């Protein structure tokens, strides 16, 4: 069955060391983990296919693993929303309800919102209070190819990391 996996998925980086061409981002994220200075909200922006979502997933897996050797221990604390196809107010309301519940094991629940620019304005507005004042046990990671389409009020409180194209 492995022979039928799309190359992009099969070769997706699983650690920061495997990410190609985003040294400043991976360095920043590794330092944040090492010093336990994690922002509660991150916005990754940049062109399609440069590693934004991969970096988000790697970070999400490592956040709760600081004391654990097994990277699968806390994978149930990671939630991913593809905003390209789940961009309604109802989708966001579900997240708003879920974030109130702290993780049963581990310190954080991590929400990755991929293609964040695809959220409707109504969905962004429904999400705004949660994004501006997330519970202490929540980390949000938004990834977008079109930062200019993300509501201007959101990036103010976010740590913004720009990914760039790499020529190999």
Predicted regions and their residues:
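Pre-Walker A (pre-P-loop) alpha-helix and adjacent loop at the N terminus of AAA/AAA+ ATPase modules
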Residues: 3-41, 97-98, 102
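Short regulatory helix/loop adjacent to the ATP-binding pocket of P-loop NTPases
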Residues: 129, 147-157
């Amino acid at each position: 069955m492995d022979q039928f996996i799309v190359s992009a998925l099969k070769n997706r980086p699983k650690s920061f060391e495997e990410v190609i061409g985003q040294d400043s981002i991976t360095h920043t994220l590794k330092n944040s983990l090492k010093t336990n200075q994690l922002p509660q909200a991150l916005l990754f922006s940049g062109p399609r296919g440069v590693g934004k979502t991969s970096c988000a997933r790697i970070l999400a897996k490592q956040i709760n693993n600081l004391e654990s050797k097994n990277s699968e221990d806390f994978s149930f604390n990671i939630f991913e929303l593809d905003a390209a196809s789940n961009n309604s107010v109802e989708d966001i309301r579900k997240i708003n309800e879920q974030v109130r519940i702290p993780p049963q094991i581990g310190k954080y629940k991590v929400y990755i919102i991929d293609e964040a620019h695809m959220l409707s304005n109504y969905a962004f507005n429904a999400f705004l209070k949660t994004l501006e004042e997330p519970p202490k046990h929540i980390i949000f990671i938004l990834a977008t190819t079109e930062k200019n389409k993300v509501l201007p009020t959101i990036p103010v409180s976010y740590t913004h990391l720009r990914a760039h194209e790499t020529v190999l």
